[in-house]
UniProtKB/Swiss-Prot annotation:
Lineage: Viruses, Riboviria, Pararnavirae, Artverviricota, Revtraviricetes
Matches recorded under CDD domains: HIV_retropepsin_like
Gene: gag-pol
Source organism: Human immunodeficiency virus type 1 group O (isolate MVP5180) (HIV-1)
Sequence ranges assigned to domain Integrase catalytic in this UniProt record: 1202-1352
Protein name (Swiss-Prot/TrEMBL): Gag-Pol polyprotein
GO molecular function: aspartic-type endopeptidase activity; DNA binding; DNA-directed DNA polymerase activity; exoribonuclease H activity; lipid binding; RNA stem-loop binding; RNA-directed DNA polymerase activity; RNA-DNA hybrid ribonuclease activity
Renumbered residue ranges of the record's region Interaction with membrane phosphatidylinositol 4,5-bisphosphate: 73-77
């Protein structure tokens, strides 16, 4: 107050106090009126220091005078007071305010007349930018426009693109210009022909109107008189520069052609602005969460584009600005009154309607203001004082509730003064001091210490209410002992506008710290030194400022030099150029949690996926979202040094016009290390204990509250593109856990667990269930105490950066939690409504099944088997599916069950768990978990797993195992079971198969329907029963086969089969034996496949043959089934093997087959090892693998394996750079043929196939079902070349897996060599060459080309070897030993060499010299010996393996 009172001293103060307020009034001016005037000037952003001098008061009067006509009474009173003060400074003798105003008017009138007289005598200056000056001869000449001005104009047009800002920019740059200069400016932007055409039309219209209103004089002109300008003369098309100068400067009859032309240009610019900015001022409305400042910016930007008079624009400002604001801001603006200034509006609405993160950040910063620093405090840098001793939680002044502040309050706003908080007056009428405790009933920082930002810094910035000291203060506790306090950097909270006192060039002033401003702009400050004029843009338009360089700015003892702009700004601003020098940072307290270190998978680099194009509205939405996230500290801008990128896109939120940002992290997820999920499932309400008090909380912005590892952030980079590549994309990276990234759930769960552990330990009576951001808090405490503990939990989370919004804070039942509805003594699932549709799609059925599965955990008897049958196979989501009668019945049954609400109860630890299981037929089961009868904790259902052959007891064991695992997870212990099976039935089955599955203890109850075994296999041969030796064989190529049996009594039955496989034939042989046998039978088979199926005692099967076998088994009294190894000389087995193999399969005989088979039976080695160790051709080795029952036991077809026969190729089309590449891959070698084709047609595909067949032997081509592959041209090419064309899934569910993998490999190589080739077709052939001949690996360590040649050569050798062996088999050998003169034989010829032969005689292989052997042809006589290789048959040829020799 002393500073303001020092405006007048001594005699001047005495004179001031003698002046009356009104004529004849007793009240006189006092010192308090000076204090009041100083404060009012600050409200109007004027310098109160100017009141100290006469010149200063005169400047204030000139500044305020234009606003008197529309100003408030307070403004008029202020102007009157300054006028009186001006008279006091000038020593004028006045008695009251009226005389002071009269004196002021007289002095000002005399000055104006003197200036007018001086102007008449001085030469006319029409412009400062383009002056028309007088030369040495006294002639008026024109000074040409400068290149710098033209450059500024062109740059403005290119940057602003005819936005509303271009009009004041044109007016500023063209001030004083003549039409010649203006046309020069327009010619400089000739690239915008569309806009200039619009401007030309406006000029023509205005010129025509000028000619109509200013007709030319009739007759010739007098000598020496210049003609009057026409419309085209004003436009500069038919006039010269000299004529334009004369018209402008010819005294009283001057015509300012330049100003007239400028008005026409402005009219055209207005039209262009309206065209380029079609948004109407009526459409500018403030969003529900949009900051008021951003809304004002958009409002005035659009207002400048409106073609209206200034009076209309003033009306729009007074009414629409308030009318179109959001409800929160509108209520505050209306409370300010109709005459509130824009500054008052922006001050009042600061933080209102903005993102809720502001309140969270500020509350977090203030709540921890005195908590983390033990034994110390942080001097908080604020505009107004605060109470460091205030205790207690944050409390809202507006609604009185704890947990938030008034600026973030959603309750209706209190009316009242924005200074003192009292109702009955507004801020402009406040007499109660500068700042009261409005919105600060309880400061957020009261009772807490701020987090320690650094170890040591300078002294505190501003004293607290108790006074400041050099880094220490006395304790205010009862002891009163002083303590040392660690010194910390100053913090400037954002509860209010961050205004500080700064010394600029030696002058003290208050300025706003504005991180959104580039420059520092001050008003009414006199700086020394040279300055340059400059124009900057602000809220109200462009303003002219003076630019001073190297000005010293001091803030709280720290100095920095920088550029300062001085001009008529409404608020003094310290911009980023000064704040950066001071070392200021904008800190958003995301979380004090230590980041979890994350790495990429070994050998992998970050994603480098290009951003795909986005529409303009999506780019604008993403820009706004990212700007807000950047302000919150969630993301940061990055430069071009980061080589990684992940594409982003935007979608509209459901039932909303707002946009949501999505990041496609699929590529990053592939490359990121794997995480262990710390939580393997969601909590179940059946496992909750019944609690007296319950609360459900939700953590707001859960992932965004956890920091991301700084070393990993670079991999999350993404780019926001610009429309038409106008500017480079804006690059960002995440500072927090991103949504959609694979590591976010695990890291957040782990971090949240660590945060909750201290609270759990200190509050053991409180039970907290945590799943992601949902928290269930239960206790048996009284409700009031329970809620206190919940508030402590919320505060605990808040200190770590996690908020729990009031909107999702559930205090009263029913509680909605994790999809469940919790009541005090029961729970249920949230209401489920099944849709009633006439037309069902696959997607509808999927959603329906999901709802029913969710309901089955409390509703008993829910069945979905028939519904699931409708969507089997690969179908489109939109494909229409007709409901079967069974599915309709099942759906209606489920509807009936869901009509009546069903509830579950809570867990009681002192009681046992029980489970009841029921069978519903067709492999469907239901179960209930309970402690008391008819009070279920949980229910569920089970459907038979994917198994071709099973029985009820096996399914029952699976149900029990499933329920047991659930019980261990939910309740931590095993329940007791009540099962629908008799003890005898179970023990009979379980005695042999106990090792198959783990089963807990149970009780056997007689609750129908009971489960029983329909047949039983004997463990020992049945004495007196007939024995059937069964076998089957099939030819892979012809699909023909035989199946049958022989008995020890000589009875036999052989049937022929068509379109069969070896496994089907084996099963058919068992079926024939069962059909032809009596009530008791022994069956012997050499097929492990058959033994495995029947010995499991299935009661149902998906295979028709197995189902028939089951039916036959149920008719028998006793059945014994055993297995014997094939081809081991077992009589009956060998006999039936010969019978079914005749004319079906042939066997290749080579040395080492027996040893290889025995070795494989021991170790089950692969065919490569057999071929290498025993010298067998690959085909023979593969046949041995195919004949192994343990290596092929799971089905009739070798699913999951690709056919690697030498003549099989896969073909597919892929796309790159908008072109089509057709690729053919040799499956066995990975050799590639590829080229670019002009179109994906059948003709081009067939032509490529012909070229492929001309180069390489192709027997089979495998493709997908694309139209180019199924075309008539492709069929014709396959027919002509004799190539078998296969579609679909012949051997592998992903039958195109080889060519798809090669497509990826080929594209990868193309990217590596792309910069070496001009055209894509060249790059494709280069990549094919690299793949085929420059990269080794895989089988044999060859290149793909070498491997292909080796395979083809091996195929030829194998074929020739087969011919040679078959030829040799037609000869027999008689031989003799060296010591025995008797000829032995005949033996089998295995090999004939130049000096010796290799023979096999009675199982022994011998090498006999050529001279001691006689070779004769076999003419069909049956050779003796049961072990002769000629009579031995193997099952191997019937197996479906590649490379079989027919």
């Amino acid at each position: 107050m002393g500073a303001r009172a020092s405006v007048l001293t001594g005699s001047k103060l005495d004179a001031w106090e003698r002046i009356r307020l009104r004529p004849g009034s007793k009240k006189a001016y006092r010192l308090k009126h000076l204090v009041w005037a100083s404060r009012e000037l600050e409200r109007y952003a004027c310098n109160p220091g100017l009141l100290e001098t006469a010149e200063g008061t005169e400047q204030l009067l000139q500044q305020l005078e234009p606003a008197l006509k529309t100003g408030s009474e307070d403004l008029k009173s202020l102007w009157n007071a300054i006028a009186v003060l001006w008279c006091v400074h000038n020593r004028f003798d006045i008695r009251d305010t009226q005389q002071a105003i009269q004196k002021l008017k007289e002095v000002m009138a005399s000055r104006k007349s003197a200036e007018a007289a001086k102007e008449e005598t001085s030469p006319r200056q029409t412009s400062q930018n383009y002056p028309i000056v007088t030369n040495a001869q006294g002639q008026m000449v024109h000074q040409a426009i400068s290149p710098r001005t033209l450059n500024a104009w062109v740059k403005a047009v290119e940057e602003k693109a005819f936005n509303p800002e271009i009009i004041p920019m044109f007016m500023a740059l063209s001030e004083g210009a003549v039409p010649y200069d203006i046309n020069t400016m327009l010619n400089a932007i000739g690239g915008h022909q569309g806009a200039l055409q619009v401007l030309k039309e406006v000029i023509n219209e205005e010129a025509a109107e000028w000619d109509r209103t200013h007709p030319p004089a009739m007759g010739p002109l007098p000598p020496g008189q210049i003609r009057e300008p026409t419309g085209s003369d004003i436009a500069g098309t038919t006039s010269t520069q000299q004529e334009q100068i004369i018209w402008t400067t010819r005294g009283a009859n001057s015509i300012p052609v330049g100003d007239i032309y400028r008005k026409w240009i402005v009219l055209g610019l207005n039209k262009m602005v309206k065209m380029y900015s079609p948004v109407s001022i009526l459409d500018i409305r403030q969003g529900p969460k949009e900051p008021f400042r951003d809304y004002v910016d958009r409002f005035y930007k659009t207002l400048r584009a409106e073609q209206a008079t200034q009076e209309v624009k003033n009306w729009m400002t007074e009414t629409l600005l308030v009318q179109n604001s959001n409800p929160d801001c509108k209520q505050i603006l209306k409370a300010l009154g109709p005459e509130a200034t824009l500054e008052e509006m922006m001050v009042a609405c600061q933080g209102v309607g903005g993102p809720t993160h502001k309140a969270k950040i500020l509350a977090e910063a203030m709540a921890s203001a005195q908590q983390d620093l033990k034994g110390g405090y942080t001097a908080v840098f604020m505009q107004r004082g605060q109470n460091p001793n205030r205790k207690g939680p944050i409390k809202c002044f507006n609604c009185g509730k704890e947990g938030h502040i008034a600026k973030n309050c959603r309750a209706p706003r209190k009316r009242g003064c924005w200074k003192c908080g009292q109702e009955g007056h507004q801020m402009k009428d406040c007499k109660n001091g500068r700042q009261a405790n409005f919105f600060r009933e309880v400061l957020a920082s009261g009772g807490h210490e701020a987090r320690q930002l650094c170890a040591e810094t300078s002294v505190p910035i501003s004293p607290t209410n108790g006074g400041g000291s050099e880094g220490t203060r006395e304790s205010e506790s009862e002891g009163g002992s002083g303590r040392a306090v660690p010194i910390c950097l100053p913090q400037i909270p954002l509860w209010d506008r961050p205004i500080v006192t700064a010394k600029v060039g030696g002058h003290l002033c208050e300025a706003l710290l504005d991180t959104g401003a580039d420059d520092t702009v001050l008003n009414n400050i006199q700086l020394e030194g040279r300055w340059t004029p400059k124009m900057i843009g602000g809220i109200g338009g462009f303003i002219k400022v003076k630019e001073y360089n190297n000005v010293t700015v001091e803030v709280q003892g720290k100095e920095v030099q920088g550029t300062v702009l001085v001009g008529p700004t409404p608020v003094n601003i310290l911009g980023r150029n000064i704040l950066t020098g001071l070392g200021c940072t904008l800190n958003f307290p995301i979380s004090p949690i230590a980041p979890v270190p994350v790495k990429l998978k070994p050998g992998m680099d970050g994603p480098k996926v290009k951003q795909w194009p986005l529409s303009r509205e999506k780019i604008e939405a993403l820009t706004a979202i990212c700007q807000e996230m950047e302000q919150e500290g969630k993301i940061s801008r990055i430069g071009p040094e980061n080589p990684y990128n992940t594409p982003i896109f935007a979608i509209k939120k459901k039932d909303s016009t707002k946009w949501r940002k999505l990041v496609d992290f699929r590529e990053l997820n592939k490359r990121t290390q794997d995480f262990w999920e710390v939580q393997l499932g969601i909590p179940h309400p059946g496992g909750l204990k019944q609690r007296q008090s319950v609360t459900v909380l939700d953590v707001g912005d859960a992932y965004f509250s956890c920091p991301l590892d700084p070393d990993f952030r670079k991999y999350t980079a993404f780019t926001i593109p610009s429309v038409n590549n106008e500017t480079p994309g804006v690059r960002y990276q995440y500072n927090v856990l991103p949504q959609g990234w694979k590591g976010s759930p695990a890291i957040f769960q782990s971090s949240m667990t660590k945060i909750l552990d201290p609270f759990r330990k200190s509050n053991p009576e409180v039970e907290i269930y945590q799943y992601i951001d949902d928290l269930y808090v239960g206790s048996d405490l009284p409700l009031a105490e329970h809620r206190k503990r919940v508030e402590l939990l919320r505060e605990h989370l808040y200190q770590w950066g996690f908020t729990t919004p009031d909107k999702k804070h559930q205090k009263e039942p029913p509680f909605l939690w994790m999809g469940y509805e919790l009541h005090p003594d029961k729970w249920t699932v949230q209401p489920i409504q099944l849709p009633d549709k006439e037309v069902w799609t696959v997607n509808d059925i999927q959603k329906l099944v999901g709802k029913l599965n969710w309901a089955s955990q409390i509703y008993q008897g829910i069945r979905v088997k028939e519904l699931c049958k409708l969507i089997r196979g690969t179908k489109s989501l939109t494909e229409v599916v007709p409901l079967s009668k069974e599915a309709e019945l099942e759906l209606e049954e489920n509807r009936e069950k869901l009509k009546e609400p069903v509830h579950g109860v809570y867990y009681q630890p002192d009681k046992d768990l029980w489970v009841s299981i029921q069978k519903h037929g067709e492999g469907q089961w239901t179960y209930q978990v309970y402690q008391d009868e008819h009070k279920n904790l949980k229910t569920g259902k089970y459907a038979r797993q994917k198994a071709s052959h099973t029985n009820d007891i096996r399914q029952l064991a699976e149900v029990v195992q499933k329920v047991s695992q659930e019980a261990i997870v939910i309740w931590g212990k095993l329940p007791k079971f009540r099962l629908p099976v008799t003890r005898e039935t179970w023990e009979t089955w379980w005695a042999e198969y106990w090792q198959a599955t783990w089963i807990p203890e149970w009780e056997f109850v007689s609750t129908p329907p009971l489960i029983k075994l329909w047949y039983q296999l004997e463990t020992e041969p049945i004495v007196g029963a007939e024995t059937f030796y069964v076998d089957g064989a099939a030819n892979r190529n012809t699909k023909l086969g035989k199946a049958g049996y022989v008995t020890e009594q000589g009875k036999q039955n052989i049937i022929k089969l068509e379109e069969t496989t070896n496994q089907k034939a084996e099963l058919m042989a068992v079926l024939i034996a069962l059909q032809d046998s009596k009530e008791q039978v022994n069956i012997v088979t050499d097929s492990q496949y058959v033994l495995g199926i029947i010995s499991s005692q299935p009661t149902q099967s998906d295979s028709p043959i197995v189902q028939q076998i089951i039916e036959e088994l149920t008719k028998k009294e006793r059945v014994y089934l055993t297995w014997v190894p094939a081809h081991k000389g077992i009589g009956g087995n060998e006999k039936i093997d010969k019978l079914v193999s005749k004319d079906i399969r042939r066997v290749l005989f080579l040395e080492g087959i027996d040893q290889a088979q025995e070795d494989h039976e021991k170790y089950h080695s692969n065919w490569r090892a057999l071929a290498s160790d025993f010298g067998l051709p690959p085909i023979v080795a593969k046949e041995i693998i195919a004949s192994c029952p343990k290596c092929h036991i799971k089905g009739e077809a070798t699913h999951g394996q690709v056919d690697y026969s030498p003549e099989i190729w896969q073909m597919d089309c892929t796309h790159l750079e908008g072109k089509i590449i057709i690729v053919a891959v040799h499956v066995a070698s990975d050799f590639i043929e590829a080229e670019v084709i002009p179109a994906e047609t059948g003709q081009e595909t067939a032509y490529f196939l012909l070229k492929l067949a001309a180069r390489w032997p192709v027997k089979v081509i495998h493709t997908d079902n694309g139209p180019n592959f199924t075309s008539a041209a492709m069929k014709a090419a396959c027919w002509w070349t004799g190539i078998q064309h296969e579609f679909g899934i012949p051997y592998n569910p992903q039958s195109q897996g080889v060519v798809e993998a090669m497509n990826k490999e080929l594209k990868s190589i193309i990217q590596q060599v792309r910069d070496q080739a001009e055209h894509l077709k060249t790059a494709v052939q280069m990549a094919v060459f690299v793949h085929n001949f420059k990269r080794k690996g895989g089988i044999g360590g060859y290149t793909a080309g070498e491997r292909l040649i080796d395979i083809l050569a091996s195929q030829i050798q194998t074929t020739e070897l087969q011919k040679q062996i078959l030829k040799i088999n037609n000869f027999r050998v008689y031989y003799r030993d060296s010591r025995d003169p008797i000829w032995k034989g005949p033996a089998q010829l295995l090999w004939k060499g130049e000096g010796a032969v290799v023979i096999q005689d009675k199982g022994d292989i011998k090498v006999v010299p050529r001279r001691k052997a006689k070779i004769i042809r076999d003419y069909g006589k049956q050779m003796a010996g049961t072990d002769s290789m000629a009579n031995r048959q193997t099952e191997s040829e019937s197996m479906e393996q590649p490379g079989e020799i027919p």
